[in-house]
From Swiss-Prot:
GO terms, molecular function: structural constituent of ribosome
Family assignment from sequence similarity: Belongs to the universal ribosomal protein uS2 family.
Polar residues bias locations: 271-282
Gene Ontology biological process terms in this record: translation
One Gene Ontology cellular component annotation held by this UniProt entry: small ribosomal subunit
Compositional bias of kind Low complexity: 293-307
Ranges annotated as biased composition (Basic and acidic residues): 283-292, 313-330
Species: Mycoplasmopsis pulmonis (strain UAB CTIP) (Mycoplasma pulmonis)
Identification of the protein by name: Small ribosomal subunit protein uS2
Entries under PANTHER family matching the protein: 30S RIBOSOMAL PROTEIN S2 PROKARYOTIC AND ORGANELLAR (PTHR12534), SMALL RIBOSOMAL SUBUNIT PROTEIN US2M (PTHR12534:SF0)
Protein keywords: Ribonucleoprotein, Ribosomal protein
Length: 330
């Protein structure tokens, strides 16, 4: 009886320990929308093992496999960072740029948030020469481009601005990084290809349309949500910070301490125009009158278009036909 009681107490302790030290609570995965994949028509069959089910034409990713992959990635990155490994964060998607830059700067890592320049890893000589040019222009800018004409100064400023934008996160990169952490291997496939060619280990977020063969370790998750990207990248950054003696923000923390950012809603131009429209009597009258005018013009154009063109074979016939076509397009 005593042995059974002891076993039960040990089992309870193990369960409590597992719940306390889970890398991320499932509730936070659900809050971040990590489980949302793409439409079923857009999936990659190689992602089948990571997909839980289908709902309303959308693939649902298996959160349990997300949790396991994320914890495994944390351990690998943590061990590598403890040995002095270097990392580069890559995310050129509009909604991923800010998060990538924030976590890379937090871990003192390299990062690319603008267009990946071909040859960043495979043609280091050219990249280093452009970085040297960046440093030279910055020194010239300190003296306000003294000794050059106003026109030359303007051109130098444009060049400097472009170089700073493209090389902001890799200007201090002297050697090849050991690991690449990429938000979307599909979008940044050139970066992934160069990393594979140079033997850089790749850890990436895999949505339902991704190819898991492109990365060394894939984390099945939604790569279109700010909350999802922030959750995954913060945990991976925690692994680096923890190895250097810092504190984890999300990894192995209490649920109350994990505060996710808000998803930014970007309205399309059509929707914003629709929202700003005033539906009072005056505006409705104007819309009605303009609609009538447009419909009359459209009917006239249709009548003219139904009339057959008179074929003339003089030298101006082609010009006349082109002019007529352009007017119809307008």
């Amino acid at each position: 009886m005593a042995e059974k009681t002891l076993r039960k107490s040990n089992e309870d302790k193990q369960v409590k320990t597992e719940n306390i030290y889970k890398i991320i609570p499932n509730s936070k995965f659900l809050e971040a929308g990590v489980y949302f994949g793409h439409r079923t028509q857009q999936w990659n069959p190689k992602m089948k093992k990571f997909i839980h089910s289908k709902r309303r034409g959308i693939h649902i990713l298996d959160v349990s496999k997300t949790s396991k992959a994320l914890e495994w990635a944390y351990k690998i990155i943590n061990a590598a960072a403890a040995k002095g490994a270097t990392f580069i964060f890559v995310g050129t998607k509009k909604h991923a740029k800010e998060i990538v830059k924030e976590q890379a700067q937090r871990t003192n890592s390299y990062y690319v948030t603008e267009r990946w320049l071909g040859g960043t890893l495979t043609n280091s000589k050219t990249i280093f020469s452009r970085v040297r040019r960046l440093f030279d222009l910055e020194k010239m800018a300190e003296n306000n481009f003294e000794g050059y004409t106003k026109k030359e100064g303007i051109e130098f400023k444009k060049e400097l601005s472009k170089l700073q934008k493209n090389f902001e996160g890799i200007r201090e990169m002297k050697t090849q990084p050991n690991f690449m952490i990429v938000v979307d291997p599909n979008v940044d496939r050139i970066a992934v290809k160069e990393a594979r060619d140079k033997g850089v280990k790749i850890i990436g977020i895999l949505d339902s349309d991704a190819n898991p063969d492109f990365v060394d370790l894939g984390i099945p998750a939604n790569d279109d949500s700010i909350k999802s990207i922030s959750l995954i990248l913060t945990v991976l950054a925690d692994a680096i910070v923890n190895a250097k003696g810092g504190k984890d923000l999300f990894a192995y923390q209490d649920e109350a301490n994990i505060i996710l950012p808000e998803d930014k809603k970007i309205d399309s131009p059509q929707r914003s125009h629709f929202n700003n429209t005033r539906f009072d009597q005056s505006s409705s009258r104007e819309h009605r009158d303009s609609w009538r005018r447009n419909s009359q013009n459209t009917s006239q154009n249709q009548e003219q278009s139904q009339r057959p063109y008179k074929r003339t074979y003089n030298k101006d016939s082609r010009e006349t036909l082109d002019k007529k076509t352009k007017e119809e397009v307008k």
